[in-house]
Amino acid sequence: MTAGSVCAPQIIPLRVPQPGKANHEIDTNTLLEMKSDTPDVNIYYTLDGSKPDFLKKVGSGENNTFKYVKPITLPDGKIQVKAVAVSKDCRQSGIVTKVFQVDYEPPKMVSSEDNVEDALKGFSKQELKNGFVGPKLRKKYKNAENKSTWNVNLRRLADLKVGERADPKTLKDLRFAESPLEIPAYHEGASARLPTHQAQSPGFAHITGQKSLTSTEIMRIQRETDFLKCAHCLASRPSDPFARFCHECGAPVPPIFGYRLPPPEGAQMGLCAECGSMVPMNTPICVVCEAPLAPQLRPQASLYLKERVICRTCGTGNPAHLRYCVTCEGPLPPTQEQWLCNGDEVPHPPARNGETISCSRCGCQNLWEASFCDWCGAMLGISASHSVCPKCGASNHLTARFCGSCGIYVKSITRFRMHNSLAIVAGAPRPFPEPRSAWQSLNVPLPTSASGSKKDTGTQTSGLFYPSGKLLAKKELEAASHRQRQEKMSDHRPVLTAVSPGRGYWRKQLDHISAHLRSYAQNNPEFRALIAEPRMGKLISATVHEDGYEVSIRLNYIQVSNKSLYFNKSVNLSDHFLSSVTEGGNGLYDSRSSLVSAYSQSVSDTPESIKKMKNLKAKSFLVNPEPLTPENKLLLEEVGSSGKGRLSVLEQLLDEGADPNCCDSQGRPAVIVAVVNKHYEAIPVLAQRGADIDQQWGPFRNTALHEATLLGLEGRESIATLLGCNANAQKKNTRGQTAYDIALEMGDDLTSSLFAAKFTQGLEDQLSPPGNRILGDS
């Protein structure tokens, strides 16, 4: 928060948290408190969703802004509360918006005297400070006869409108009744008549919910405090008993019956020298001992102190007729007598509808916004103790915004001048509520310039670019769209939930997985270290398995090696080339086995072959598994864990049309299924019928030779059979390992010897003539 800014108000419901209910769900009896961390600020709020406007004038539209005085209640329904904090120098905070769902709750009917005492104690200290305290506790209820007489007289006045005069006899009966302050019947009637004015403004709907006290409580509060509030803005009633309009909102206020003059001020009381009693000083004799007060008010000496001028340099008091200090000989500030003696005429600018202030030193008339005199430089003090209405001339309080007599909007000149003086003392900038001119224009004759001094000069205007309004609006739209794109591209972190929703909400399911994966990585350093190492490409496959207790999710990404080569899954790549459609599948390669061998050869070949492989723009993607034919299903069952791997059955199924390259539900080829289940006799049969023995599968892209090596001693026969069928021992998986590397890593000497024998035989075949090559190297 920047220096000097006003803290935004807080809207807090005063209640104990209830289980099962959100913070915005309240009832009509719940009090709402508004407060700001910045001291000495006023809070204004609205209840209809409009922006609070605390400077709105009467006649410029419907005024729905209220000043916060004490905790309020809301009517039932969905209520949107907007509040803003305003300091004394008109600095505003940000607007706070809060929406409440208010349920109707009948008011609590309390009639005991103890609960009334608790209700009286529940008011805030701010209201007690503002004067919400009665002088003393009144006497208890009078008899029923006095009450009935008082209520009858009140019924006569209940039909009067605001501003009308009442019958003198009725006022006399009210003034001399036994209990002139017990007027609950009038307030109930008056509150019933107020909705005619409130119906025009929906923002006043909370007033009725706020007056939820019973008649006994209202009677007790009225009797103990003798305090009324404005029914529209809940501000304190004007201290003037004859005021007809509220000083804060300008709404009409009902008259008070039984007017009482305010008590005399403290300055009118004095101590009598004869009897020592505090008596009024505006009487000729003491009201206690009847001693004359005129001699006591006279001064004891006939010599009066002359006016002194304080030196601004050393602080010495000097006679008023001197111009230089007698101590430091510094210049003294001139007084009004010196201005008049010197013959300097003090200027009097034209009055602006009474908006001027007179200087106490030289008498110059200055603007009401000025803090110092334009002529002598003296600070302008607050001379008036009240503001004057420019329309009717009535006196109002310094802080009054509306005239209490005629109800028009009043520019509180003295109030703004007081704020300006306070701001100067505090070192803060003065607020200027509206534009003003700091100086008055003066007709000063200027010397005429010679005609020969004029020269014609030119400025460059060509080549300068002046943007048009459309271009500026277009730039603003582009900036707004750019901000929206940046917000959409921002990192979205889903909320960590305990249980995912399921039931088809796949987006929420993914958010649940992402949030828990992030949380698991933050809490497990080992997993963080493992997941941070590999370089991954795009996602090529994803599977979900559930067994009633756990849900397993497996994601397969392409791993990027140091040479930035993508080892894509070779699932029938020849079916996705253009030649497979135009030339029947034999336009680029002779068979599937040749394509796979060429691809594996290009991976482990020279960089020239790598460049050639990059030119093949074949897009690799997963093919949805086609439903297995009965022949393929029987073939996989025969080489599976439940089958026996009988050669006669396999040959019969292959003759009937079974595919030797078919895959099971997990994507494993038939050759790998036979190797995993130790049916090594079936490998030559499948290889002779066209099975690709170097086909890769799984997340690690292992071949049948890799799977046989992982079996250890149990896969020795399968390794020998695969090598006999000319399996590629140089084929690498995604980890960059061949089957021989896996055997060396496992420390299996017997398996390593099989690969060493194969390598030796391959070297001999390269050195021998072509006619002596073994069968199967065609």
From Swiss-Prot:
It comes from Mus musculus (Mouse). Pfam families: Ank_2 (PF12796), DZR (PF12773), Fn3_assoc (PF13287). The keyword Phosphoprotein applies. A zinc finger (DZANK-type) spans 230-289, 359-407. This is Double zinc ribbon and ankyrin repeat-containing protein 1. Involved in vesicle transport in photoreceptor cells. It is found in: Cytoplasm, Cytoskeleton, Microtubule organizing center, Centrosome; Cytoplasm, Cytoskeleton, Cilium basal body. Keywords: ANK repeat, Cell projection, Cytoplasm, Cytoskeleton, Metal-binding, Phosphoprotein, Repeat, Zinc, Zinc-finger. GO terms for cellular component: cell projection; centrosome; cytoplasm. ANK repeats lie at residues 631-662, 666-695. Coiled coil: none annotated. Interacts with NINL. Associates with DYNC1H1 and multiple dynein intermediate and light chains as well as actin-binding proteins. GO terms for molecular function: zinc ion binding. The modification Phosphoserine is found at residues 179, 201, 768.
